Amino acid sequence: MRAAVIGLGVEGKKAVNSLLRHGWEVYATDLNNRVDLSDLDVPIMSMDFVNDEQTVSIVSDEITVDLGFTNSYAIEQCDAIAIAPSMYGGAFATRLLRDSPLLSDVLDKHKSMFTIGITGTNGKTTTVHMLKNILESAGKKVLVGGNGGGGFSGYYDLVLEAEEGEYDILLVEVCDMTLDFCNYCFDFDMVGLTNIGNDHMDVHKTIANYKDSLVRFFKGKTVFTAFNQDFNADFKEAAAKSISYFSYQDELKLVGAFNLLNAGLASAIARELKVPKDVVRDSLADFEAVRGRMDVYKINNASIYVGKTDNSDALASILSEKDFYALFIGTPRYNEEHRLDILDVAVKYNPEVIVLFPGLEDTVDMAMYRLNSLGYEGNIKTVNSLDEIIELVAEYSHEDAIFIGGNGQDAIIDIQERIKLISEKL
C-alpha cells in the first residue's frame, strides 16, 4: 500500500513515520522547501537527493519526498492520502479529497470502536492520561493517542494502530485547531472539554469563533463540560447529552486547582462508563504528572515548578496560586509572536526576576523587547543552555518558589529531568 502525505508539519511528519512503521510506502510533499526533515525515521544514507535553489527531491526505496512543489501524478498513484489536519476544509484539501480517499476512509476499523475525545485549550494531555489509567485499571484495553503537539504520534497513527489491534476503547487527544478534521476522521461517542482559553488565536481569531467550532464538534455527542464553563447553554443545545463536572475532591498528587478540574473531568467520564468508584479513586491517587507537564521538585528551600505553559491562561492558572521569586520563560517560534502574551501575564504578577531561554526557537530578543515595552522593572536575565538554567536555579534555590515553563516542550522536558535528578540526590 502507498500513501501520499500532504504537508510536513508536526502531524505530517508523524504520519510519515507511522506509515513507514506499518509497512506502507510513502510519497510526501510540502511547498516549503526548507522543511526540517531530521525527525523522519529514515536513514539519510539510504536516500538520493536532487536539489536546486527552489525545490528538493529525496528518494529512497520506501519514501519519496518533494519539497517546494507537489507531484500530482505521484499522489494519483497512491491508495490513500494523509493531509495535514490544519489543511482540512480548505480549497486545496477539498480538491484533493474529491479525487483521492483520506487514510481514515481506506482504513476504517477505528470508526467501529467506542471513542472518547478530550479537547480544550489546556490540560488535554494530563486528562487523557488520567482517564487512560482509570480505564485500564478497570480492565479495558485502551488505544490512546492523537494530537502530535501533545506528545502523541498523531491522528493517523491511531487509524493505523486500530486497524491492526483489538481494543475496547479509542481515546483521542483533540487539538482545538483540528476539530473539524477529527470530527470527520473519528466517530466520537463522548467528548470532554477541559476549558476554553487564549491560545491559537492566530487560527480562531476570536473566542466566539472557537466556541462555534466546538458547537459543531459537539453536535450529537455526549459532552462533558465544567459546571461553570462559558457557553454551556450553546454546548448543551448542540449535544445529544450534556454532563457537568466539578473539581475532584479526593486524593491527588498533582498540584493546582486546574489539575483538580482535569481529574474531575476524567472521573466524570469514568462514572458515566460505570467504572467503580474505588477504581477511579485508587487510579487517581497513584497518578503521577505526565512528562513535560507541571510538576514540583524541592531543591534546598525552593519549590521548583516545572512544566509546559505556552499560553497566557495556562501561565495565569499557575501564578494565581503561588508567589514566585523567579520565572523562567521559554520563547516561542518567530511566527508565533502572539504567544509572547504570556509575558504580559508574567509582568502582571511582578516577580523579582524573569529569565528568558530559547524554547521552540531562539526568539529571546523578541521577548526582551516585549518585556521592556511592558515596563517591567525587575531583573531580566537571558540564558542559552541547560547548564546556565541550572546555575540560576541553584542561585535562587534559597527562595521560596521558582517557576520554569513557557514554550518549548522538548526544552522543558530536558530541564525537568535535570531538576528531578538534582532534587532526588539532595
Which role does the model predict for each range below?
Residues 10, 122-126, 260, 309:
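Residue-level detector of alpha-helix initiation sites
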